[in-house]
Curated annotation (Swiss-Prot):
Originating species: Drosophila melanogaster
Gene designation: Ada2b
Phenotype seen when the gene is deleted: Lethal during early to late-pupal/pharate-adult stage, without any gross morphological abnormalities.
Residues binding Zn(2+) 2, per UniProt: 27, 30, 49, 53
Protein name: Transcriptional adapter 2b
GO biological process: chromatin remodeling; regulation of DNA-templated transcription; regulation of transcription by RNA polymerase II; wing disc pattern formation
Region (Disordered): 318-372
The keyword Zinc-finger is annotated on this UniProt entry: yes
Length: 555
């Protein structure tokens, strides 16, 4: 049987010593005795060889009947050389394969391999079982384009919208989709001199793998930047000066917002980035609109048609408060002569005769007011801290003589000597007067004589109780010293603490009970009411717990 080694072995005729090409005649009785067909036909006999010895025809690989039958069949030697050349030079490199075979052209080599080893019997017996053993991947994404594997997400990026001159200036090659000078051009230097060797230690191998990993990361960054350039069309925007900061139809606030948010564009595609900006701008518009609607509802408006008249009214009354969510500051307080308060006055500034004017008007609201009756307007939370009392001002009120005076006034008011004195003290609580900032010393001077005669107050109170029990509400007034009467008269003219004219009777009683100044109470009330109108917020929960703990709320 002929082996692969025999295919490339040269044989010579023992009789004529010529090279045997093709079939030779081998003597079965003599050792290493081969004859060519010409010498065998002539009946040559040499040495011990006789022409009547047994013989057999041997094929050296050049016979046309060796592998494939038919017209134009290749010899076994040529088939072996074809397979070796394809393994060495690769499928498709038919020019080099033809040179390796030496007897066939490139077209013949391609046709022979495709017909015999791909589409022929060998190909059907070899490739078909291999294809059937491959795992089958099932597409579970469906027909819709939603999700990360949808058609929209996997679609190719749009081409750069530039002409040939602009591409030449940038060094951009459209067919290759790359630039002559790429981003981070020195990245290839990390692995340009790397080569694996059998003498490398484990540390050397790990170091080379680390270099490859760094190079891969830099390639990813290069690809990411190229994707952003293509997705956002930065090249065309550069030449046409159509960046986002100069887009037509954008306000100054929108341009500033887009400039601040531009750093996040690297995490989104162009369409996602535009949708995100549009959503954020829409959210801001809805918040502003919600604040406007809250302001309208705060002022008692329930129909959109009423808002136009309300805005016209708020524009004319520039110093009136239209609610905690509005912009038109108004003031429902007037002086006794009907003039408006100066614009420079704050919420906590003293306001003379506020409740007298309200009572004299018969409880009617001001003609310029749209808010409901008996509605206390607070400062606009959208404004700066100008409407809130300063820290030094609040600290001066806390623990001041005015606060002590308010408590002592309440104690003295409880010592009612007669009905006239009771009426006078009560009218002092209802009638609000101006409180100068330097009233602390005067209040101390008025209260000092009272503190020196506590027994007089106690004895007068006991004497009045005895007379009421005995006389049943007689009009006789017990005798008192002239000094005590003078002090009680002076109590009627004591000024109230700042901010008292803005509080109701219940709120004043609450301030007295918990020993806090009206300005402090107004500040706390302003902070509580000017927050976002949302229920269940952490701020609301904290304040509610604090109020319940202090006893301001029952539940």
């Amino acid at each position: 049987m002929t082996t692969i080694a025999d295919l490339f072995t040269k044989y010579n005729c023992t009789n004529c010593q010529d090279d045997i090409q093709g079939i030779r005649v081998h003597c079965a009785e003599c050792e290493n005795f081969d004859l060519c067909l010409q010498c065998f036909a002539a009946g040559a006999e040499i040495g011990a060889h006789q022409n009547n010895h047994s013989y057999q025809f041997m094929d050296t690989g050049t016979s046309i009947l060796s592998v494939f039958r038919g017209k134009g069949a290749w010899t076994a030697r040529e088939e072996i050389r074809l397979l070796d050349a394809i393994e060495q030079y690769g499928f498709g490199n038919w020019e080099d394969i033809s040179k390796h075979i030496e007897t066939k052209s490139a077209e013949d080599a391609k046709e022979e391999y495709v017909n015999k080893f791909v589409n022929g019997t060998i190909g059907r017996a070899t490739w078909t079982p291999a294809q059937s053993q491959r795992p089958r991947l099932i597409d579970h994404t469906g027909d819709d384009d939603a999700g990360p594997l949808g058609t929209n997400a996997l679609s190719t990026l749009p081409p750069l919208e530039i002409n040939s001159d602009e591409a030449m200036q940038l060094g951009y090659m459209p067919n290759r989709d790359s630039f002559e000078r790429e981003y981070d051009p020195t990245a290839e230097q990390l692995i340009s001199n790397i080569s694996l060797s059998s003498e490398d230690t484990e540390v050397d191998v790990m170091l080379k793998l680390a270099h490859v990993d760094i190079y891969t990361r830099r390639l990813r960054e290069r690809a990411r930047r190229k994707r952003m350039v293509r997705d956002y069309q930065l090249v065309s925007n550069f030449f046409r000066n159509r960046n986002y900061a100069q887009q037509q139809g954008l306000t100054k606030e929108q341009r500033e917002f887009r400039d601040r948010f531009r750093v996040y564009a690297q995490f989104y595609t162009c369409n996602e980035y535009e949708r995100l900006l549009g959503s954020l701008e829409r959210e801001k518009e809805l918040r502003i609109r919600q604040s406007e609607l809250y302001r309208y509802r705060y002022n008692g408006l329930t129909k959109i048609a009423e808002c136009t008249h309300f805005e016209q009214h708020a524009a004319t009354a520039t110093h009136r408060s239209t609610g905690p969510y509005g912009h038109g500051k108004t003031d429902h307080t007037h002086t006794s002569n009907g003039s408006h308060r100066p614009p420079s006055s704050s919420l906590h500034s003293p306001q003379p005769n506020l409740r007298k004017v309200e009572m004299s008007s018969g409880g009617e609201a001001s003609s310029n007011s749209i808010a409901p009756r008996n509605t206390l307007h607070i400062a606009d939370p959208t404004c700066s801290g100008a409407l809130l009392p300063s820290k030094n001002y609040l600290d001066s009120c806390r623990g001041s003589s005015a606060a002590t005076m308010l408590q002592t006034t309440g104690m003295v008011m409880g010592v009612t000597v007669d009905s006239g004195a009771t009426t006078g003290v009560t009218s002092t609580a209802t009638t609000m007067a101006n409180l100068p900032t330097n009233s602390a010393k005067g209040s101390q001077q008025h209260l000092q004589p009272l503190q020196q005669h506590p027994q007089l107050l106690q004895s007068g109170n006991q004497h009045k109780m005895q007379n009421e029990a005995a006389g049943g509400g007689s009009d006789q007034v017990p005798s008192m010293s002239l000094k005590l009467r003078t002090q009680l008269e002076e109590l009627k003219h004591l000024p109230q603490p700042p901010g008292s004219e803005l509080l109701s009777h219940n709120e004043l009683d609450l301030c007295k009970k918990h020993n806090i100044t009206p300005t402090t109470y107004l500040s706390v009330k302003t902070v509580c009411l000017s927050g976002a109108p949302s229920l269940g917020s952490p701020m609301e929960t904290s304040l509610r717990k604090f109020f319940i703990k202090c006893g301001w709320l029952s539940h």
